[in-house]
Amino acid sequence: MRLSLWGSLLFFSFFVKHLTSLDPNTDAYHLSSFFSAMRLPNSPQAHTFSSLCSWPGVVVCDSSENVLHISASGLDLSGSIPDNTIGKMSKLQTLDLSGNKITSLPSDLWSLSLLESLNLSSNRISEPLPSNIGNFMSLHTLDLSFNSISGKIPAAISNLVNLTTLKLHNNDFQFGVPPELVHCRSLLSIDLSSNRLNESLPVGFGSAFPLLKSLNLSRNLFQGSLIGVLHENVETVDLSENRFDGHILQLIPGHKHNWSSLIHLDLSDNSFVGHIFNGLSSAHKLGHLNLACNRFRAQEFPEIGKLSALHYLNLSRTNLTNIIPREISRLSHLKVLDLSSNNLTGHVPMLSVKNIEVLDLSLNKLDGDIPRPLLEKLAMMQRFNFSFNNLTFCNPNFSQETIQRSFINIRNNCPFAAKPIITKGKKVNKKNTGLKIGLGLAISMAFLLIGLLLILVALRVRRKSRTWATKLAINNTEPNSPDQHDSTTDIKQATQIPVVMIDKPLMKMTLADLKAATFNFDRGTMLWEGKSGPTYGAVLPGGFRAALKVIPSGTTLTDTEVSIAFERLARINHPNLFPLCGYCIATEQRIAIYEDLDMVNLQSLLHNNGDDSAPWRLRHKIALGTARALAFLHHGCIPPMVHGEVKAATILLDSSQEPRLADFGLVKLLDEQFPGSESLDGYTPPEQERNASPTLESDVYSFGVVLLELVSGKKPEGDLVNWVRGLVRQGQGLRAIDPTMQETVPEDEIAEAVKIGYLCTADLPWKRPTMQQVVGLLKDISPNY
């Protein structure tokens, strides 16, 4: 290892030594300077131009000693590229610096007017793109994916009229897509996925690219309608995890269903309406179809029997009714089938079980027996779920854990095993045989009754005992106190109670793992506590970091109803919500499991951050993101979902300081009588002082308190709301501004934020704005955000 390092240093020293022998006005000199500045180990010897051009796979030159192509992918180049290096190679046509650790680009890079292909993917570039990117008039391929580039996509990109491939995915681009992009009519592939792009797409976007084969806009914040994107040449379209709305037929130009080229279509997690189009039969190459989680009208199963290439089909939460057609058995290549959360009826049809790996038919109204060939295949599948139907099954080989996870509310109709009475060498006496059978049945029934009585007694005793998690949180019990029991029986029971990990079905755990990871839910592992229960930090088996929310006991919901609620919560997806990834139902304890992404909550940011005050831009970003999350719960979910505990402690900030609202949907799992005046805090509206249940309007009030907390930097204690409202009525709202903000405070913006907080905290619920209106008001404060 030492010899190798010493050899690299010798190479590098020799490389720098001969740099001075090159003409400073040649490509050889600029290239040598580039490799030297980027600390390239094992660099090529630079004493002649030919030695540079002979380095295989990296540099290609012409006879005039011009560098035409540079391919330096994955060479561990690091740092900033200085000026007067590659930016001076005026004949350069191809530049591939992908898979390195480059942090910034030289200002003269954009002068390379002959550049045809630029690949800077998988680096560490964070600075915004300059407008002079439009100088690349000859560019065909632009790949800046997997960086941290922020700001807008510059309008000057419209100058790249020869562009065929645009890859900007997995960055931090914000705002909307520039309208000028529609002038790049040669585009074959567009990938803008996994950014923070929002607003509506430019007018004519769908029909602007007649040659387009691949479009990926997934995992952004786009809204509005999209017209004419599913034209006859397109092969791949992914619009998932956005806020697109409008009729689904608008996607089809002229409503002509000619999709002979379509291979991949994903429209999931949007708000499209209408009916699933029945013209899919022409898409004979279609292999991946995902239309899940939209707002389609009630409809029968679409025609899919001719989609022989289909290997992935997800139509969950698409409002399907009636039966699953038998023609689905023709799909012999199908690997994933998800039809969950619909209103499907009838029997489970015979499926082609040869290739299937994932099957989810849960939360429907299916009845009858599950086909035996399908049951026999389940052991070889990655994931399956038949829960919450009217189905029956018989497979004595299933473990109790499997039944509790995938057959919830499903009847096991396996008969009791009975050994036949066999008499060897003697004639059977029918009278004695009948007597023995009767006696055996009587004894069996007696044992059964005794067993049932023992179970009832055990349950009664267990109800009277103190629960292990909630009591510990409420009473602050010490780990070794006599009130806390941890008997061998408890441990045995804990190992038999499964944990359901929704997106990680192969991750097998039990309640015992959760207890071990939190030291039996010790207060020392608690992250925060609220009305919906304490939340504990844990590292689960396999190194999975989790946040475990223990919901207080006493709810009137059955285990089945709680399971349904958890499954539905797990399907709610929004960039500003902290998603549920699993759950555990343990007698009277209901545990929600979230992935702990090492986030900080807003309460800590504002009040436990010493002298390091959060700037106004960040505070506005947090307010807007939280408002969007609440607007989605109130107006994007059917039926509308009340949060019930909006406060600084339940607003988490990820690594990009994007807010994630936690604990949503848990209010349904609490007592019907929501905690009243004895648990009031500064976020509670006046009407809840009378033990009223939380409402959409009370969520708005709580958000208003959070907004005033962001503006003032004060904790919601004492009389914060009345103090700020009094200042506003006196025309002195600016006095509420947090004096610790470090930057020059845009007083006009903060004054508007104070007014929004004033509106949200109105005494009368009907005077408060909706969360949709609040989002609009916050966007108007800083329209460029």
Swiss-Prot record:
It comes from the Eukaryota. It is found in: Cell membrane. Residues 521-785 form the Protein kinase domain. Residues 1-21 form the signal peptide. One of its GO terms (cellular component) is plasma membrane. ATP binds at L527, W528, E529, G530, K531, S532, G533, P534, T535, K549. Its main location: membrane. Keywords: ATP-binding, Cell membrane, Glycoprotein, Leucine-rich repeat, Membrane, Nucleotide-binding, Phosphoprotein, Receptor, Repeat, Signal, Transmembrane, Transmembrane helix. Belongs to the protein kinase superfamily. Ser/Thr protein kinase family. This is Probably inactive leucine-rich repeat receptor-like protein kinase At5g58150. It comes from Arabidopsis thaliana (Mouse-ear cress).
